[in-house]
Regions:
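Small beta-barrel nucleic-acid-binding modules, primarily SNase/OB-fold domains
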Residues: 2-192
Length: 192
């Protein structure tokens, strides 16, 4: 029988996999009366409030980051767009806005699902025919730095849809972001 957590603590949040950057905010929310923490764990990545399958994009932060209507900040995994003050940063923001602003997006998770800034990392799909059937987030993982062969086809349910990262790269407004010491991401090979 699983013991029910009676008090919100930093130790418990770490145990269920919450990133350090999120812990102070969650503790403060708990002190102020938020009880949603009781629905967290044992695997934070399965929590659909923190890691939604889809959403409507309301705010474009920069060329590779946006915010959904529920406040979740999403960073497009696998690519890096010019940041504020860099050449083509404005163009990247405009293109991302044209692709996703006020539209429904579907989020496909990979072996890395969040970053140190508290953003969700996801492959972002648009214009899907119906709810896509994604492979599990750990599909690529064979070990820490070894992966299965990457995916090249669109997921079932999104055969006519578009991968936002791919559209940004085609426009010359994002570059492939790889990590030599980590394993390959699902669509990394497709973007090369």
């Amino acid at each position: 029988m699983v013991k029910k957590q009676s008090r919100l603590t930093a130790k418990w949040l770490r145990k269920i996999g919450v990133k350090e950057v999120l812990i102070p905010g969650l503790l403060l929310a708990g002190v102020l009366g938020w009880t949603g923490w009781q629905k967290l764990g044992p695997d934070i990545y399965r929590n659909k409030q923190a890691f939604p399958d889809s959403g409507i994009v309301r705010v474009i932060t920069d060329g590779d980051t946006f915010e959904l209507q529920n406040g979740v900040r999403v960073r497009t995994v696998g690519v890096n767009a010019p940041g504020r003050g860099e050449e083509k940063a404005g163009e990247a923001v405009k293109r991302l806005s044209d692709l996703v602003k006020d539209k429904k997006v579907w989020l496909e998770y990979d072996r890395y699902q969040d970053d140190k800034y508290g953003r969700v990392l996801a492959w972002v799909w648009i214009n899907c025919e119906f709810t896509p059937k994604f492979l599990p987030s750990d599909y690529m993982r064979l070990s820490f730095n070894r992966s299965r062969p990457g995916l090249t086809e669109n997921p079932e349910g999104c055969k006519k849809g578009k991968l936002v990262q791919e559209e940004m790269m085609k426009a010359g407004l994002a570059k492939l972001e790889t990590y030599k010491v980590r394993g390959e991401l699902k669509y990394e090979g497709r973007l090369r």
